[in-house]
Amino acid sequence: MTTEAVIVSTARTAVGKAYRGALNNTDGPTMAGHVMAEAVKRAGIAPGEVEDVVMGCAMQQGTMVMNVARKGAIRAGLPVTVAGTTIDRQCASGLQAIAVAARSVMLDGVEVAIGGGIESISLVQNDHMNKFHVVDDELMAMKPEMYMSMLETAEVVAERYKIGRDKQDEYSLECQRRVGAALQAGRFNDEIVPFTTRMAIVNKDTKEITYEQVTLAKDEGPRPETTAEGLAKIKPVFEGKTISAGNASQLSDGASACVIMSDRMAARKGLKPLGIFRGFVAAGVEPDEMGVGPVAAIPRLLKRHNLKIDDIDLWELNEAYAVQVIYCRDKLGIDPDKLNVNGGSIAIGHPYGMTGSRLTGHILIEGRRRRAKFGVVTMCIGGGMGAAGLFEIVH
């Protein structure tokens, strides 16, 4: 009899602004442990029932070094018998972690696992970041595009596929509007677990650092008051180009976790799953246009499950840049009314390793509200890849 992997709970921090937000001084194990503990609590299981923890993290150094999944599990109060591993597929790390955890349930007899993701851009992507030998000279000579910044690749997509600033800003404005409406309706409330932590505050004049206890209960990034005129006034990062702070995802901190178990265990416990993991694929594209990755991954995923674009009721795309969402949406023929229905990372933020897990939790909760059947979580990936995961929503 085939074992199905079902997601029975999800929990995430609110997304904090990198460097100047509430999570700018929160260490990785503590942040990861906070969402793991809450996901276990929401699932109504004993901590010792978890066999393995899989967490995605794109920048595994500093506070995230040496397996933050295992450290987070211990910090969550899970017993030492609970194992942990940390995965890096850049922006798809959180989704990859959920896929690995789900496959362990489907194929290896694991009854309960945690899949999720985490990123602290504040504590890792800073002046202390280890850049020793960050470039392999031989790879640079062979494929220099592997070392392009994500921003540079976004400009390539804009130029190559003729997607202008106006279209990008128009998309971003709609993103902020959708997030604003979702916030008013409380559509993120069931995902977020408030987090009391110690925030670092830097005095602009003296540079002195003080610390303040704060509670983060809502995403810090959204600006629903954004106007078209305001977006148009923001200067592009590169002079004469199209990508600006208004049409790109923000630098952010955050963590998310989902409890995944076998369908038989869920039935035995009388738990009603949020959804069923159905499949995951990754695909490579040219690294200089990494933003188009979903265009390679999604058809592969759908073909393996005998589905078409129109069979999918909800789509969540990581939204690294407006330009890549526009290209992927239009190239694949995705209905805009089914895509990022409550906004995305341009407004909320994009903690690289966390996002895939956040989107999974959100698509399952929103899918249930909308009586949807199938949802796809997808993203572009630094280095030139795309990933996509298929979930069936349970009502």
Regions found by a protein language model. Give the residues of each.
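Conserved active-site "lid/cap" helical segment
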Residues: 1-58, 62-64, 68-72, 76, ...
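Active-site pocket-lining segment
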Residues: 55, 152-155, 191-193, 197-201, ...
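N-terminal extracellular/periplasmic Venus flytrap/periplasmic-binding protein-like
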Residues: 12-14, 25, 29-34, 167-268, ...
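Condensing-enzyme catalytic core mediating Claisen C-C bond formation in acyl metabolism
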Residues: 1-28, 226-292, 296, 303, ...
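Short, well-ordered amphipathic alpha-helical segments that serve as non-catalytic structural scaffolds
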Residues: 28-44, 68-72, 97, 150-157, ...
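Conserved catalytic cysteine-centered active-site region
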Residues: 57-111, 145-152, 225-250, 331-359, ...
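Active-site-proximal alpha-helical scaffold in enzymes
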Residues: 87-118, 158-188, 257-264, 329, ...
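Flexible glycine-/small-residue-enriched beta->alpha junction loops
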Residues: 102, 106-160
